[in-house]
A protein has these predicted regions:
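N-terminal low-complexity, acidic/polar interaction/targeting segments
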Residues: 2-311, 318
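A short Gly-Trp-Pro
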Residues: 305-419
Length: 419
């Protein structure tokens, strides 16, 4: 089973764009290959330097394990996933104390989407942290990673530094499994070794010449009344290959082989990068069967590409196209970032947008994409703040311009079916 790892790469920040050398008028849209180092945004360097590595090995709990108590952090704007990198930044005294308590006592925390959805939350492990005092204000910055889905039985409080800290009581690790192919139920287990079908996923983007012909792969279908096209649709390798085919264009030159090859981890990863509303992601997170989750992900992707439209969430005017989505981070075309006000945004990056208005001068402070400066974007029809324009004048970086839209304010158009 191949697990994703979080790598910290050495970075020279001296090449960042300064105000004195920035000339917005000299910037033009750049098409073609992306040359930007897309590992930089995934490292969340804007959180600052001098992070301390959290001690401890990878957290792993058996299914149905009970955690008697664990600190809670509410984040109502974003649904988090196992395997996802999670940035946290706090300046308010209560939140700072909650994060310090989680760091010092547990090295883990429970991230809750909303009070109504405590039935399924995420256990996150602290990878590194920074506690500092800047201009008289205490800040706590954390880099964490999602580990397990968890069900919270109840929420109570405990006292830390004269502050009430929310605690999850009797949190139960939820089971994740992969349901069997329908044909597996009519095949003798002793025949598994001579029938293919368990490793036909085209992770590399090239055809697998070692797989058996489909007619042999579905040999047992001769003994059922189930049409072959239905069995083909339900086949796990076909399902994953269809999903990879829909998402491959988002990556440009970034190898998609970075995606996890364990089926359950892959289902978490591909669901996390979908540019859809939080309630739809929550419904996907509630699913225990990875096969079912992947089927629903594929259905959403097919509808997204059918309508091929990203609209303002307030007035529904056309803002962009699904075809224009690109990955400016090694984590994928979407990502979770936090601003100086501790507000979390899940964004999707595009190479072009329409019906937008820019405001302000480009700023480089707290930039989520090192070497880029940002400007505010608003819907030209209703004035709704929808995201940011990122620009660079460095000639060795492509693209010179791209756009990040917050999924709180825009939505990919799909039909009204809810998953």
């Amino acid at each position: 089973m191949l697990k994703r790892k979080c790598y910290i790469y050495p970075v020279k920040m001296s090449t960042d764009v300064t105000d004195s050398e920035f000339d917005e008028d000299a910037i033009s849209q750049t098409e073609g290959e992306i040359t930007y180092d897309r590992h930089l945004p995934a490292m969340h360097l804007y959180l600052g330097n001098n992070f301390i590595d959290a001690f401890g090995s990878r957290l792993f709990y058996e299914y149905d394990s009970i955690l008697r108590e664990i600190p809670i952090v509410f984040e109502e704007n974003v649904v988090f996933w196992p395997g996802q990198t999670i940035p946290l930044f706090a300046t308010s005294p209560d939140t700072c104390k909650a994060l310090k308590y989680a760091i010092r006592q547990f090295i883990e925390m429970c991230l809750v989407y909303s009070v109504e959805n405590i039935s399924c939350s995420i256990i996150a492990q602290v990878l590194s942290y920074r506690i500092a005092n800047e201009d008289g204000v205490e800040i706590v910055a954390v880099r964490a990673i999602g580990r397990h889905r968890v069900h919270i039985d109840s929420i109570e409080t405990t006292i830390f530094e004269n502050t009430d800290i929310l605690m999850a009581r009797d949190a139960k690790i939820l089971i994740d499994y992969v349901s069997r192919n329908p044909l597996d139920y009519i095949r003798l287990p002793s025949l598994d070794r001579i029938f293919p079908g368990k490793s036909d996923v085209d992770w590399s983007g090239t055809s697998n010449t070692n797989t058996f012909p489909m007619v042999e792969k579905f040999y047992e279908s001769k003994f059922t009344t189930i049409p072959k096209w239905i069995l083909n649709r339900l086949d796990l390798s076909v399902l994953i290959n269809n999903i990879l085919e829909h998402t491959r264009d988002w990556y440009n030159t970034l190898p998609i082989t970075n995606s996890p090859m364990d089926v359950t981890d892959f289902s978490f990863w591909v669901a996390s990068i979908l540019p859809i509303e939080a309630f739809r992601k929550m419904n996907l997170l509630l699913v225990s069967d990875a096969r079912t989750r992947l089927e629903r992900v594929l259905a959403i992707l097919e509808k997204m590409y059918h309508y091929n439209e990203i609209a303002c969430g307030l007035c529904e005017i056309d803002i962009g196209k699904v075809d224009d989505i690109i990955s400016m981070s090694s984590n994928g075309p979407t990502g979770v970032y936090v601003n100086t006000a501790s507000f979390m945004h899940e964004i999707v990056t595009l190479k072009s947008v329409r019906n937008i208005e820019e405001s302000g001068r480009p700023k480089g402070s707290f930039s989520w994409f090192p070497n880029y400066k940002w400007k505010l974007l608003a819907c030209s029809n209703c004035g709704n703040h929808i995201g940011w324009k990122f620009i660079t004048s460095l000639t060795n970086i492509s693209p010179s311009v791209f756009y990040a839209l917050t999924l709180l304010k825009v939505r990919c158009v799909i039909d009204s079916s809810s998953y």
